[in-house]
């Protein structure tokens, strides 16, 4: 056995002999509980932040989708108007313009 294993065995034997092993285990347990509660608090904080960011992201994506739909509708509507105006201008040019201007 190496030195640390022998030392640990002697320490545990002493603690059992003196009746302090239970007290030491309770102290270790309380330290572990405190560490767990701190880690759990941080974990819950991170989860809450992720939930908040997820909600904000979904709202922004929804707004982006709505804006994109409105933009495409406006482009389609204006495209039809421009095509209609182009046809009218071509018709007027064909009737009244100089033949060199008409293709």
UniProtKB/Swiss-Prot annotation:
<keyword id="KW-0426">Late protein</keyword>
<protein>
    <recommendedName>
        <fullName>GP16 protein</fullName>
    </recommendedName>
</protein>
